[in-house]
Protein backbone atom coordinates (compact mmCIF):
# COMPACT_ATOMS: atom_id res chain seq x y z
CA UNK A 1 0.00 0.00 0.00
CA UNK A 2 1.29 3.43 -0.92
CA UNK A 3 1.07 6.09 1.79
CA UNK A 4 0.81 9.69 0.62
CA UNK A 5 0.38 12.96 2.49
CA UNK A 6 -1.28 16.14 1.30
CA UNK A 7 1.11 19.12 1.57
CA UNK A 8 -0.70 20.34 4.69
CA UNK A 9 -0.62 16.89 6.34
CA UNK A 10 3.09 16.54 5.56
CA UNK A 11 3.76 19.92 7.17
CA UNK A 12 1.84 18.82 10.27
CA UNK A 13 3.61 15.43 10.33
CA UNK A 14 7.07 16.98 10.13
CA UNK A 15 6.02 19.38 12.89
CA UNK A 16 5.40 16.39 15.16
CA UNK A 17 8.90 15.13 14.33
CA UNK A 18 10.32 18.30 15.86
CA UNK A 19 7.83 18.88 18.68
CA UNK A 20 6.57 15.61 20.12
CA UNK A 21 8.13 12.20 19.42
CA UNK A 22 5.47 10.40 21.49
CA UNK A 23 2.67 11.74 19.29
CA UNK A 24 4.71 10.95 16.19
CA UNK A 25 5.04 7.32 17.35
CA UNK A 26 1.26 7.16 17.83
CA UNK A 27 0.65 8.52 14.31
CA UNK A 28 3.10 5.99 12.84
CA UNK A 29 1.38 3.16 14.74
CA UNK A 30 -1.97 4.29 13.34
CA UNK A 31 -0.63 4.37 9.79
CA UNK A 32 0.68 0.80 10.18
CA UNK A 33 -2.66 -0.26 11.66
CA UNK A 34 -4.57 1.27 8.74
CA UNK A 35 -2.30 -0.61 6.31
CA UNK A 36 -3.08 -3.88 8.11
CA UNK A 37 -6.72 -3.45 9.13
CA UNK A 38 -8.26 -0.78 6.91
CA UNK A 39 -10.95 1.22 8.68
CA UNK A 40 -10.87 -0.77 11.94
CA UNK A 41 -8.34 -0.81 14.77
CA UNK A 42 -6.71 1.68 17.13
CA UNK A 43 -7.79 5.30 17.61
CA UNK A 44 -11.57 4.72 17.41
CA UNK A 45 -11.92 4.99 13.62
CA UNK A 46 -15.09 6.71 12.47
CA UNK A 47 -16.40 7.77 9.07
CA UNK A 48 -16.81 11.50 8.59
CA UNK A 49 -19.99 13.11 7.29
CA UNK A 50 -21.13 16.09 5.23
CA UNK A 51 -18.34 17.77 3.29
CA UNK A 52 -15.86 15.14 4.48
CA UNK A 53 -17.94 12.12 3.45
CA UNK A 54 -15.62 9.30 2.35
CA UNK A 55 -12.90 10.32 4.80
CA UNK A 56 -12.16 8.60 8.10
CA UNK A 57 -10.86 9.96 11.40
CA UNK A 58 -8.87 8.36 14.23
CA UNK A 59 -8.06 9.89 17.60
CA UNK A 60 -4.37 10.61 18.06
CA UNK A 61 -5.15 12.05 21.50
CA UNK A 62 -7.96 14.10 23.08
CA UNK A 63 -7.30 17.10 20.83
CA UNK A 64 -5.74 15.79 17.61
CA UNK A 65 -7.10 13.61 14.82
CA UNK A 66 -5.64 11.67 11.91
CA UNK A 67 -7.91 12.24 8.90
CA UNK A 68 -7.37 9.92 5.96
CA UNK A 69 -8.93 8.20 2.98
CA UNK A 70 -8.33 4.74 1.54
CA UNK A 71 -8.47 4.66 -2.26
CA UNK A 72 -8.60 1.56 -4.44
CA UNK A 73 -8.40 -2.14 -3.67
CA UNK A 74 -5.78 -4.85 -3.26
CA UNK A 75 -2.18 -4.14 -4.26
CA UNK A 76 -3.11 -0.79 -5.81
CA UNK A 77 -4.67 0.47 -2.57
CA UNK A 78 -3.50 3.91 -1.48
CA UNK A 79 -3.67 5.64 1.90
CA UNK A 80 -3.92 9.42 1.67
CA UNK A 81 -3.32 11.34 4.90
CA UNK A 82 -5.18 14.67 4.87
CA UNK A 83 -4.60 15.93 8.39
CA UNK A 84 -2.80 14.97 11.59
CA UNK A 85 -3.53 17.78 14.03
CA UNK A 86 -6.59 19.38 15.62
CA UNK A 87 -10.22 18.74 14.79
CA UNK A 88 -11.65 19.07 11.30
CA UNK A 89 -11.87 22.51 9.72
Please provide the spans of the model-predicted regions.
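A short, hydrophobic secondary-structure junction motif
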Residues: 31, 37, 85-89
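PIN/NYN-family metal-dependent endoribonuclease catalytic core
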Residues: 5-6
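Enriched for short, Lys/Arg-rich terminal
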Residues: 2, 11, 15-24, 58-65, ...
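A short, surface-exposed loop/turn module that caps and links secondary-structure elements
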Residues: 32-58
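Short alpha-helical linear motifs
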Residues: 29, 49-52, 68-71
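PIN-domain endoribonuclease scaffold, especially VapC-family toxins
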Residues: 24-32
Amino acid sequence: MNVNFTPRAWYEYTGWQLEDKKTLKRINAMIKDIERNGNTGIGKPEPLRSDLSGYWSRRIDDENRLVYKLIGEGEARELVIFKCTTHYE
